[in-house]
Amino acid sequence: MSKEVISEEGQVHQHGKDYVDPPPAPFFDMGELKLWSFWRAAIAEFIATLLFLYITVATVIGYKKETDPCASVGLLGIAWSFGGMIFVLVYCTAGISGGHINPAVTFGLFLARKVSLLRALVYMIAQCAGAICGVGLVKAFMKGPYNQFGGGANSVALGYNKGTAFGAELIGTFVLVYTVFSATDPKRSARDSHVPILAPLPIGFAVFMVHLATIPITGTGINPARSFGAAVIYNKKRVWDDHWIFWVGPFVGALAAAAYHQYVLRAAAIKALGSFRSNPTN
């Protein structure tokens, strides 16, 4: 087991560890606005979310317009489309922006002090704008089928109530954000650094598995930007009536995943208490 030693200056030195926990991000840092790397990351989130929505919603519309089930990708293909695109885009953008592509993921990482409030807000705006543009491209290229088959928008399916849909979104997002925390944990990253695809792969696979479970209930949101972009472009009352589910459910799921990972699995509360007790100046 590793041991923490606190020096007189209050610095924590960790022995026997082959990894270093990064320091917490500042809560709010206006200085980030002056950095090109900050805006480059926001642009990367915008483009990644645009591409994600274009490919996935186009896949959904293509599936729905096929009259022969054997000629379409099926629900399994839709799930692979979402999971596969997340795998590809996280792999491409992780080194630039962290590869969030999802306001719920950004929110969870903010709660864990991985990103500042300012960065989280800018990322969410970029993600929502990218989602709107991505779905807009689908409508421009496939206008007839797009309008006819629901625009890929999320809503509560017939036979399910809003409580069930909310629970499905909450649990689905918990699975995703929990996987993000686990895949990007410094301990695991140090151990698996020689295989760079090991972080994007489980994240994409989590998205795939959640889609298999929740497509019949809500069409699978677990990403407020995905749901918002589709709702804005499709713009039907039924979609907007259910829309709150696709923000509140994922954000509550992200909150639960962040708390579980930080305070149960990583035992952040116990470590903080131990450091407090071992420092005689406190």
Swiss-Prot record:
GO terms for molecular function: channel activity. It holds the Pfam family MIP. Its main location: membrane. InterPro entries: Aquaporin-like, Aquaporin_transptr, MIP, MIP_CS. A motif (NPA 2) lies at residues 223-225. One of its GO terms (cellular component) is membrane. A motif (NPA 1) lies at residues 102-104. The keyword Transmembrane helix applies. The keyword Membrane applies. PROSITE patterns: MIP. Disulfide bonds: none annotated. It comes from the Eukaryota. It is a multi-pass membrane protein. Belongs to the MIP/aquaporin (TC 1.A.8) family. PIP (TC 1.A.8.11) subfamily. NCBIfam families: MIP (TIGR00861). Water-specific channel. This is Aquaporin PIP-type. It comes from Atriplex canescens. The lineage of its organism: Eukaryota, Viridiplantae, Streptophyta, Embryophyta, Tracheophyta.
